[in-house]
Amino acid sequence: MNSLFASTARGLEELLKTELENLGAVECQVVQGGVHFKGDTRLVYQSLMWSRLASRIMLPLGECKVYSDLDLYLGVQAINWTEMFNPGATFAVHFSGLNDTIRNSQYGAMKVKDAIVDAFTRKNLPRPNVDRDAPDIRVNVWLHKETASIALDLSGDGLHLRGYRDRAGIAPIKETLAAAIVMRSGWQPGTPLLDPMCGSGTLLIEAAMLATDRAPGLHRGRWGFSGWAQHDEAIWQEVKAEAQTRARKGLAEYSSHFYGSDSDARVIQRARTNARLAGIGELITFEVKDVAQLTNPLPKGPYGTVLSNPPYGERLDSEPALIALHSLLGRIMKNQFGGWNLSLFSASPDLLSCLQLRADKQYKAKNGPLDCVQKNYHVAESTPDSKPAMVAEDYANRLRKNLKKFEKWARQEGIECYRLYDADLPEYNVAVDRYSDWVVVQEYAPPKTIDAHKARQRLFDIIAATISVLGIAPNKLVLKTRERQKGKNQYQKLGEKGEFLEVTEYNAHLWVNLTDYLDTGLFLDHRIARRMLGQMSKGKDFLNLFSYTGSATVHAGLGGALSTTTVDMSRTYLEWAERNLRLNGLTGRAHRLIQADCLAWLREANEQFDLIFIDPPTFSNSKRMEDAFDVQRDHLALMKDLKRLLRAGGTIMFSNNKRGFRMDLDGLAKLGLKAQEITQKTLSQDFARNRQIHNCWLITAA
């Protein structure tokens, strides 16, 4: 009896144990990452030929304690290598694990290689050669703490390489994991199986091979036992012949069918090639088709299983499309696949929740470094009384109501950018802004007392409902998470796409960027204030401080300002402002752009202006500013400097976003100024719910 070890992906150990026992293995013992078992020579070959789950089958040779590199060398050399393989065979060493002595895996592999070579040369035998790419023998050494485990890898290449996959293609899941997913899906061979996001077809091919009794090792050309001195070619040929006979019989007797589709024509072509190479191409129908076009291929029965490994996203900007995809799949399953089973394998359990289906079973597994889950569902047959469940129904109803109200209003006003929803319902704590045919959903970061999983699921429901109610393409929804602004945080960069969208606001054309920054380049709540500046600016010299992207300057210029001066500390935003001005034909010396610390510039400037707009941050301690700034504390000092630049009869429009801001009217009077609050006049319909989003004042000489 041989003592053997079969490795596998984390989470598949018990499944592998059952498979090995069915092959005839005895004394099976599950450990993390694999199964120890025993079997005769025939079982060695059968496990290599028939295991669909094992990553490798290894023959343990011994263990040794490693307190020095010499311990490793002597421990390896103690094995009788001349009984393992002939000197004419090539070999390679795979070394994994480190300790205080062996701190580099390459160094560990070199010491093992030296010990093996010396074991031959000391017996006056020819030195075996190393071949890292295609060796006859693979030696596996795993170092854990002070113990090195040494084994012969009888597999050669990993057993997931069945011999049918185009090696140029990147598989999101290995074939061994795909086989496990099939086994756990609840699908019964002999019933239909459909994968609507099949990629290169791995799940369907593994299922078809399982259903037709085709051994996973049947198409492999190389094995790790070819140079093994104890290899029994006669028994191996018997095992191989039996596998060939069973495969022919299984294919001839199989009567059901498999269906695969994907939106990518190139991967569908690869899937067809892979299926043909696997010997089961005639059983699978592959189509180029998007999930939105998915239909039941057997509407009159029999019932089958939909099995897939749908895409998932690691970036926030990919989530809206994936949420829409999963929501759509859930609706299609309910509408077209009543009575069928559904099984999905995913690295994102939250996305699976978008199906709006209740899972009957779930399994955990690792896909490389990713923690994944497989959930199985039974789709109830629909009845005449069945009504589709609405995702986030209260939110959807409010959004639909707001859309009806604001869409017509915005069209009459001549604006393309407006707020559709602003945390109207406390449990749906987001803002939804429309920018032409795009939508930005801003999630207000939930308090730490709210369960993170529930908050994320609520957000996914919001996105699915938003896409459904507004009827937009998922790739036209941008998702952001917003926290309370502190200083310069509003200017932090989120991406590098550099994609700008031209929008219209009254008679102005402006560039917005929906993805690269937390804000888009256009503060929607200041829309009316900008229009007022345009109406007040005819024939006047206009100054815009803390100008951001210069949208207020554009309105002033279009309103007939004699000159405009735009000041901001950010080169990025000044360049953006210049683009906005140029878009509206506002170029030349009359329109100056100045990069400077606005407070420092204000103290040093000696020019005069008729109309000044200033919208400073609530608080700022930017390294590039000379002093920290607090709008409540410092607004009088600001007004003192502004008064010096204000021409007789001129006006300052002063705005800020500090909640509870209190204007020091007595202090203003001492400066010879008076203030008129116009906050309510500058709040448009879409911001009527949030009356503290900004406060705005007109300041003139007393």
Swiss-Prot record:
InterPro entries: 23SrRNA_methyltr_KL (IPR017244), DNA_methylase_N6_adenine_CS (IPR002052), RlmKL-like_Mtase (IPR000241), RlmKL-like_Mtase_CS (IPR053943), RlmL_1st (IPR054170), SAM-dep_methyl-trfase (IPR019614), SAM-dependent_MTases_sf (IPR029063), THUMP_dom (IPR004114)
Entry's Gene Ontology molecular function annotations: 23S rRNA (guanine(2445)-N(2))-methyltransferase activity; RNA binding; rRNA (guanine-N7-)-methyltransferase activity
Keywords from the UniProt entry: Cytoplasm, Methyltransferase, RNA-binding, rRNA processing, S-adenosyl-L-methionine, Transferase
Catalyzed reactions per annotation: guanosine(2445) in 23S rRNA + S-adenosyl-L-methionine = N(2)-methylguanosine(2445) in 23S rRNA + S-adenosyl-L-homocysteine + H(+); guanosine(2069) in 23S rRNA + S-adenosyl-L-methionine = N(2)-methylguanosine(2069) in 23S rRNA + S-adenosyl-L-homocysteine + H(+)
GO cellular component, one term: cytoplasm
Residue span(s) of domain THUMP: 43-154
Subcellular location: Cytoplasm
Gene3D superfamilies, alphabetized: 3.30.2130.30, RNA methyltransferase domain (HRMD) like (3.30.750.80), Vaccinia Virus protein VP39 (3.40.50.150)
SMART domains, per the entry: THUMP
Main location: cytoplasm
EC number: 2.1.1.173, 2.1.1.264
Job description of the protein: Specifically methylates the guanine in position 2445 (m2G2445) and the guanine in position 2069 (m7G2069) of 23S rRNA.
Similarity annotation: Belongs to the methyltransferase superfamily. RlmKL family.
Protein's name in the database: Ribosomal RNA large subunit methyltransferase K/L
Source organism: Shigella boydii serotype 4 (strain Sb227)
